[in-house]
Amino acid sequence: MLKEFKEFIARGNVMDLAVGVIVGAAFTAIVNSLVTNIINPLLGIFVGSIDFSNLVFTVGSAHFRYGAFINSVINFLIIAFVVFLLIKLINKLIAKPAEEPEEAVPSQEEKYLQEIVELLKQDKIEH
């Protein structure tokens, strides 16, 4: 069983997934900091509140923390946009350059037609 586990862990795609999860977690921390420390204050200038996470409305004893939801939506949009850009970049790097079409070799019939056209041009010039 230990041997099977080692083989499973040693597979490339499992290691790639592990690295992706770690990098994703670190990236999430960066995005959270960006939203909390830069974007929220900028939006707060226009809305009149600097910290969205404190935005709450209460109905009876229920507290609706819509500010935290706004922060989560902003985080999601930033992460989704960055993932979109990364996928676009990866696809661009993976995509094979478009092969230029080879110049078509004229068929025998096309060669004869070209010769006839040239002869007609010469005949026209001589008359």
Curated annotation (Swiss-Prot):
Q: Which GO terms describe its molecular function?
A: mechanosensitive monoatomic ion channel activity
Q: Which cell locations does it reside in?
A: Cell membrane
Membrane-spanning regions, if any? 19-39, 42-62, 67-87
Identify its membrane topology class: Multi-pass membrane protein
Protein family membership:
Belongs to the MscL family.
Q: Subunit structure, briefly? A: Homopentamer.
Which UniProt keywords are present, listed alphabetically? Cell membrane, Ion channel, Ion transport, Membrane, Transmembrane, Transmembrane helix, Transport
| GO annotations of cellular component type | plasma membrane
InterPro entries cross-referenced by the UniProt entry: Mechanosensitive_channel_CS (IPR019823), MS_channel (IPR001185), MSC/AndL (IPR037673), MscL_channel (IPR036019)
Which positions are tagged coiled coil? none
Any idea what job this protein has? Channel that opens in response to stretch forces in the membrane lipid bilayer. May participate in the regulation of osmotic pressure changes within the cell.
Q: What is this protein called?
A: Large-conductance mechanosensitive channel
Where is it mostly found?
A: membrane
Lineage of source species: Bacteria, Bacillati, Bacillota, Bacilli, Lactobacillales
Q: Which Pfam families has this protein been placed in?
A: MscL
